[in-house]
A protein has these predicted regions:
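Feature responds to low-complexity, polar/acidic, surface-exposed segments characteristic
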Residues: 2-4, 15-41, 56-72, 79-107, ...
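A short amphipathic alpha-helical interaction element
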Residues: 46-49, 74, 78, 112, ...
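Sec-dependent signal peptide recognition
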Residues: 8-14
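Hydrophobic core segments within long, regular secondary-structure runs in both alpha-
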Residues: 43-46, 109-110, 173-177, 254, ...
């Protein structure tokens, strides 16, 4: 309705060139695990976590990235790096009905309960350590363990972010929201976030590694790349009049840009990228208003997008190309809305 394929290609190319400034060099590493060659998606995560003593492999020299992880194993992965081993060894009992003296995971579970990483009685009477750990559970526990405050951080953003993370009152919503902003996860090829998916060792390694890198200020490039990917999705969806997909993507793109800004608030390219993400969010809202025949709102939101794009190139002049394209799209939306307002219904 408002966006052409030619404009979409120009926007994405400009953004890709701009965020390339944040490319982080990759150094060659020797593989520690027989089943994780250097080109495996989990390679870098496993090597880093092994170097920090957080995750180890098996006696046969493998990592087994596809092996499922239960809740007890997940708690150990999360708790072991932050609670000293002596304290864990001193634990002799737990109020959980299914955690007994002699269980290898007793100390880790009790340390997690005492530190607010997991809920205990009376809210939860059983730990269910043998159950597979689900993605949202692992993400929540990891955030709690690191005092991330996901219920407060970015709480002003109350937007559906995927078809399976669309209800703002779902218990896992704030944790998945912060997971996107901290580069812990992103959508898959199916456009979903899969909060209820059982995790493997490889999954846990990736999520943990990404979060530790984010805390260390080393995921800015990844977050800006994710914001770029969401812009591609937005414009492709709008070409197909798929407004829901565009809305999900605009929310995720905004979260990714906000996450980068939380990490590197003084970087001009990050400041400009945030304004760009905000501009695309305004464009999507304008498109929705157009579908609802709220043409006054279209012109207002298109104007907002125009102004945000102007601010983006002021902050980061190398974003001029994408900012100009946003303004071209904004003008087209506003002009179309004005024409429709003057057309007899």
């Amino acid at each position: 309705m408002y966006v052409s394929l030619q404009k979409r290609q120009a926007v994405c190319t400009a953004f890709a060139l701009s965020i390339g400034l944040f490319t982080i060099p990759v150094h060659a590493q020797t593989a520690s695990f027989k089943d994780l060659p250097a080109d495996h998606p989990v390679f870098a995560a496993a090597e880093y976590l092994k170097s920090k003593g957080i995750i180890s492999g098996y006696s046969d020299g493998t990592f087994k990235p596809d092996k499922g992880v239960n809740r007890a194993e997940a708690i150990k992965i999360i708790v072991a790096p932050i609670i000293d081993a002596a304290s864990i060894a001193q634990v002799t009992s737990s109020p959980f009905t299914d955690v007994k003296q002699g269980d290898w995971f007793l100390g880790y579970v009790e340390a997690a309960r005492q530190n607010g990483i997991i809920d205990g009685p009376p809210k939860k009477t059983a730990f269910n350590g043998g159950n597979p750990v689900l993605k949202a559970e692992f993400i929540k526990m990891l955030q709690q363990a690191n005092n991330a405050k996901p219920l407060e951080t970015l709480s002003e953003i109350q937007l559906p972010i995927a078809p399976d993370v669309a209800k703002l009152d779902d218990w896992f919503y704030p944790y998945m929201r912060y997971a996107i902003a901290s580069s812990m996860t992103m959508i898959g090829a199916d456009g979903l976030l899969h909060p209820d998916r059982p995790l493997t060792r490889g999954d846990c390694a990736l999520i943990l590694h990404r979060y530790l890198m984010y805390k260390d200020g080393r995921r800015t490039q990844a977050l800006l790349s994710e914001a770029e990917s969401e812009i591609i999705i937005i414009l492709g969806a709008l070409e197909k009049n798929d407004i829901m997909t565009a809305e999900f993507a605009s929310a995720r793109g905004l979260l990714a840009a906000r996450g980068a800004h939380l990490s590197k608030p003084d970087e001009p390219i990050v400041q400009g990228a945030l304004k760009t993400a905000e501009a695309f969010r305004a464009l999507v809202r304008a498109y929705r208003a157009g579908l609802n025949k709220q043409y006054d709102e279209v012109t207002k939101l298109a104007g907002d997008a125009w102004n945000l794009a102007s601010r983006a190139k002021e902050l980061a002049p190398n974003l001029a190309a994408i900012s100009d394209q946003v303004q071209t799209i904004s003008k087209g939306m506003a002009d179309s809305a004005r024409t429709l307002m003057q057309t007899p219904q």
